[in-house]
């Protein structure tokens, strides 16, 4: 909010934050689906932790099903979906089969890393566009 120049001391009607941390993957997907189906004019959904919508990030079938669900939501509700998935420790590859599927289907993949010169700064680079 601060980076966008928006006030941080009051709620905004056009931003809705939903915490699904304690929900199962199936329940989280149901909640997202319900919200998309019952709210109007949603233009952007940010899923910080796409891994939390899966039981097994290395399952090819579960990965494909989740990617298909994201694509369905994107098309059906005419919105952009931004997901966050961490990289493998030690290399620049996204984690699990879901990482491979996201890379294959994503419009743009961005990598966010801490600056080597200042740990208080994050650097963003395009892995592919």
Question: What do the PLM-derived regions correspond to, one by one?
Answer:
Residues 1-61:
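Conserved inter-motif catalytic segment of the P-loop NTP-binding fold
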Residues 44, 52, 61-129:
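Phosphate-binding/switch region of NTP-binding enzymes
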